[in-house]
Amino acid sequence: PLYAYINENAPLGFDIPDVSMFGMLKISADSHPDALAYEYFGTKCTYGEMLKKIRTVSDAYYALGVRKGDAVTILMPNTPEAVLSIYALNRIGAICDIVHPLSAQEEIKKYINSVGSKFLLTADLCCAKVSAILDETSVEKVVVASPGDSMPFVMKKLYALKTRKSNAVPADDSRYIMWKSFVKNNSARAKEYKPTGEQNEKSAIILHSGGTTGVPKNIMLSNRNFNAFGMQSIITLYDVSVGDKILAILPIFHGFGLGVCVHVCFCFGACSVLIPSFDAKKFGSTLKKYKPTMLFGVPTLYEAMVNADGVDDLDFSFLKYAVSGGDTLPKPLEDKVNA
């Protein structure tokens, strides 16, 4: 059935490059370094710039003690710091254990200990939960990043003022290090090392199921899993290329979000517009502002879209693809989306 949706000139088979997730991104970066890789509240980064940032962050994690095969838990929304960390850790050959930042603290503890993470990247908004369970986990070092770190100057200051009380980081605990200091100090101290170019078939990413059929499970995914998804998408979405734009509303702690809105996007050489939290009321203005050429979502996202303010008057000619997954899209909703 899939063949009916594939361009007649596209090959029905493909080879998966024998590289890591970082290796796939590097192919795009080497091919078009000046193309936009991601955008975040108006802050833009090209592929060439992103590659440099990944190497710097990779050096910082290595200096912190992360090595090939280590598990690093990431407790973050869709931010540049989270995405850079995923590819930086993949460059080392470490395994990213990605957890929903709104998980209850006992769930966070369980996920961390289930993979034996010695290192944690957390959003500042999760610090209270992390502090409550840190002594009961395997974590030795905590890197704290803020959703405001990569925002434009004025927006960053406003975010800091708004959240300064609720996002307090323990001042007297040496296990914590802020993102800016982490990158600046540790990358400067990193000794030369040869990043792994090998496939880690055991696991590159660990995600967690929702527990709909029982106890939530750890889902281990390899570099090849993600790269196969990327190559399949390149063939299926045959007219997507450099300059296209994906609205990354689906979260990175879900396979659909990390796989399509981030990794597949980078395989295309397209731009991922990172949205850290979904606001249904602002969905119409978000679409109008960014004009994505591709939209990937679950049915509830499309329900929010058709009911959002300003959508009825919006010219959707910028949109090449609207793809729904994760659940059945009801026919009445499909008709509204296509109207």
Model-derived features: positions:
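Conserved AMP-binding A3 loop
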Residues: 46-48, 204-228
